Amino acid sequence: MPKVGMQPIRRQQLIDATLAAVNEVGMHDATIAQIARRAGVSNGIISHYFKDKNGLLEATMRYLISHLGEAVKLRLQALSDHSPASRLQAIVAGNFDDSQINSAAMKTWLAFWASSLHQPQLNRLQQVNGRRLYSNLCAEFSRVLPQAEARLAAKGLAALIDGLWLRSALRGAAFNQAQAIALTTDYITFQLRGHTPP
């Protein structure tokens, strides 16, 4: 019989162990046994909580996505200026939060994206995450741009966020937050030029 209250602790241990294993050997080579050993639990615990490796990857991605949402939320709440430009910059900064650009997170995101092409449950999670980003960006651009322009600007900014992140991840280099913020700020400024919020 499992100890009462241990489930959240065990789940977090396994998520942390998954991030570490993916960072070291990649998702493909990270075995259930390696992850369990890193977490200091038996293989059966992974099956108990997550069913299989895909379930563990899904839980790990939900964890990263939760941190992403929290990073964006905190930046939006901290704003004193609620202009579309400031809110867009806060959304961008949340996407480039340390929780999303450390080596383990970046490698896990890459593994997730690759797996989501073949796993329907992971694909649904990716679609929800992608739509959320697009919707948030579109809502801010729509405050000052006509709907069609706002949609296009949101698609462009989402592509820029993902592209900057992906290029850094594939290079294996440390993510240059300052450069990414500067490039996305230039894009936002260009898209909003000549427009003021009502």
Swiss-Prot record:
Transcription regulation in keyword set: yes
DNA-binding region, residue range(s): 31-50
Record domain HTH tetR-type: where: 8-68
Family annotation (PROSITE patterns): HTH_TETR_1 (PS01081), HTH_TETR_2 (PS50977)
Record-level GO BP terms: glycine betaine biosynthetic process from choline; negative regulation of DNA-templated transcription
InterPro entries named among the record's database cross-references: BetI_C, DNA-bd_HTH_TetR-type_CS, Homeodomain-like_sf, HTH-type_TetR-like_transc_reg, HTH_TetR, Tet_transcr_reg_TetR-rel_C_sf, Tscrpt_rep_BetI
NCBIfam families: betaine_BetI (TIGR03384), PRK00767.1 (NF001978)
Main function: Repressor involved in the biosynthesis of the osmoprotectant glycine betaine. It represses transcription of the choline transporter BetT and the genes of BetAB involved in the synthesis of glycine betaine.
Entries under HAMAP family matching the protein: HTH_type_BetI (MF_00768)
Protein name as it appears in the record: HTH-type transcriptional regulator BetI
Lineage: Bacteria, Pseudomonadati, Pseudomonadota, Gammaproteobacteria, Enterobacterales
Gene designation: betI
